[in-house]
Amino acid sequence: MAAHRWAVWAVLLLRLLVPAARVLANMEGDALHSLRTNLVDPNNVLQSWDPTLVNPCTWFHVTCNNDNSVIRVDLGNAALSGTLVPQLGQLKNLQYLELYSNNISGTIPSELGNLTNLVSLDLYLNNFTGPIPDSLGNLLKLRFLRLNNNSLSGSIPKSLTAITALQVLDLSNNNLSGEVPSTGSFSLFTPISFANNPSLCGPGTTKPCPGAPPFSPPPPYNPPTPVQSPGSSSSTGAIAGGVAAGAALLFAIPAIGFAWYRRRKPQEHFFDVPAEEDPEVHLGQLKRFSLRELQVATDTFSNKNILGRGGFGKVYKGRLADGSLVAVKRLKEERTPGGELQFQTEVEMISMAVHRNLLRLRGFCMTPTERLLVYPYMANGSVASRLRERPPSEPPLDWRTRRRIALGSARGLSYLHDHCDPKIIHRDVKAANILLDEDFEAVVGDFGLAKLMDYKDTHVTTAVRGTIGHIAPEYLSTGKSSEKTDVFGYGIMLLELITGQRAFDLARLANDDDVMLLDWVKGLLKEKRLEMLVDPDLQSNYIDVEVESLIQVALLCTQGSPTERPKMAEVVRMLEGDGLAERWEEWQKIEVVRQEVELGPHRNSEWIVDSTDNLHAVELSGPR
């Protein structure tokens, strides 16, 4: 009798708990569906947001963790309008809320202050009005806050100064008013974070507040002119906007500089100023390091600390005085008069490109003889090293991680092309330049080191930069680079991810195979040997349909004509499952009627196998 009574109670308890669990599991889905109902979606990007599905992790533009909690909502540049909803505050585990470049209006819900795990809040380039919620000061893990290019009004909440993790702040191009806070995390931000808010005043701007004494913004640091010695003729250009006071001071005490010069070790080829005369200079969170700091960090650029070598110079592992690990890129370039100004300008541009999937520039060092860039150290190396140089004791990249790398790197490149002004063309997209952070999230590195692309014009270079096997045919033959140059390199990188092979490998000649990875892949596809393409390290632990989809994206990206390649923003959408089937079907129809595409011979590259061979509408679907 007692056992029967317990059984009855157990059944009743289950009837109570199961609905409660369903409600809890579906809370995030309900919150996102509320957002969908408040948004106008002309392109149907939210079509997969089905409220009948308990788990929103199956929806496009939504990313979940292993516990099926929503950690990312990515709806940037989706032509959405409407308003946000307070229910967004129920996404307790959300880390990234990306709603930039839409037409969303109304106020920013104060409930966003409940998202205490939020790392990045990107609402820029919308039509938001009203004040910045004071509750955003609760987001103590927030690193990126970009609310620029809206119509926000009122004062800047002082609560934001308590967010010590804040690295990037952009409130520019709004209607904010009052005094800019200057304490806490705000002490490191420059006027560029608050530009084009006519009613703002205070030290964070160039305008003093009423009743306050006038002030002059601090001038940018002006590097000293090196001491002249026999056989030396180096000189430096002035930094734009700098003043000559610092240089004049140094010339007033030449004995100090000369004494320092005499104390240098004969084998050193550096020129630096004493640490006490090289104050820290911050551009937002960008630090200017002294050369001595980086010499100490890298053990005087010891060969044992070399992480890699590339077309731009060597990269050294270093440990700063605070114990943090960094990667120091020591650039090799010819010194030209005025080069300091150009270098600082490019450094500032690179530092403004901040995205989860871009390698963040931590600082720089500039002397008359040295140019160095300081980045966070990526402990998991590059995709190339993980594919082909991993120790036997470490597991290979699994298929799920490779898919994440494909999507993350696409998002990073899309940001460089569509959200940087001027846009940044990478020009050397390859597996070796896709780094992996501690969570194996893709981080695009080495961007901005080539000449920056002007917003409107195609950049023509006298020297083609890039790596054999990754260079787009039109770039190799004409020297003209564009976003589509990067798209081609990205497509080759996808093939590296799928196959584990190098983009150019003479070893394939031993089997009478093509040395170019793209041609090798196309040859196997013509023979319908898809299983031969996949990296053996995966040991068949992959999903066939996902491999096919990734190959389709790679082939679309590596078409011979740059005009026929998708933009990186389109690539992101295709990887998220939006529009790939239609684009692939369209491509197949064109290939059926198209004759063999012949490009003109590449300049100085007769040995290169043409990578634009017709695939005759290769089928990548159906049973095998």
Curated annotation (Swiss-Prot):
LRR repeats lie at residues 91-115, 117-139, 140-163, 164-188. Residues 26-237 are extracellular. One of its GO terms (molecular function) is protein serine/threonine kinase activity. Residues 205-236 are annotated as: Disordered. Keywords: ATP-binding, Brassinosteroid signaling pathway, Cell membrane, Glycoprotein, Kinase, Leucine-rich repeat, Membrane, Nucleotide-binding, Receptor, Repeat, Serine/threonine-protein kinase, Signal, Transferase, Transmembrane, Transmembrane helix. It is a single-pass membrane protein. Expressed in developing lateral roots, shoot apex, leaf blades, lamina joints and flowers. Expressed at low levels in leaf sheaths and panicles. Glycans are attached at residues 103, 114, 127, 149, 175. Residues 1-25 form the signal peptide. Gene3D superfamilies: Phosphorylase Kinase, domain 1, Ribonuclease Inhibitor, Single helix bin, Transferase(Phosphotransferase) domain 1. Pfam families: LRR_1 (PF00560), LRRNT_2 (PF08263), PK_Tyr_Ser-Thr (PF07714). One of its GO terms (biological process) is brassinosteroid mediated signaling pathway. GO terms for cellular component: plasma membrane. It is found in: Cell membrane. ATP binds at residues 307-315, 329. The chain crosses the membrane at residues 238-258. It catalyses: L-seryl-[protein] + ATP = O-phospho-L-seryl-[protein] + ADP + H(+); L-threonyl-[protein] + ATP = O-phospho-L-threonyl-[protein] + ADP + H(+). Over-expression of a truncated intracellular domain of BAK1 induces partial suppression of endogenous BAK1 expression, leading to an erect leaf phenotype. This could be a potential tool to improve rice grain yield at high density planting. The keyword GTP-binding does not apply. Plants over-expressing BAK1 have brassinosteroid gain-of-function phenotypes, including enlarged lamina joint angle, stunted stature and hypersensitivity to 24-epibrassinolide (BL). Plants silencing BAK1 show decreased sensitivity to BL, are semi-dwarf, have abnormal growth patterns in leaf development, increased expression level of pathogenesis-related genes and enhanced susceptibility to the rice blast fungal pathogen Magnaporthe oryzae. Belongs to the protein kinase superfamily. Ser/Thr protein kinase family. LRR receptor kinase involved in defense response. Does not seem to be required specifically for XA21-mediated immunity or basal resistance to Xanthomonas oryzae pv. oryzae (Xoo), or immunity to Magnaporthe oryzae. Involved in brassinosteroid (BR) signaling pathway. Acts as a coreceptor of BRI1. Forms at the plasma membrane a receptor complex with BRI1 which is activated in response to brassinolide. Phosphorylates BRI1. Required for normal plant growth and leaf development. Possesses kinase activity in vitro. This is LRR receptor kinase BAK1. It comes from Oryza sativa subsp. japonica (Rice). The lineage of its organism: Eukaryota, Viridiplantae, Streptophyta, Embryophyta, Tracheophyta.
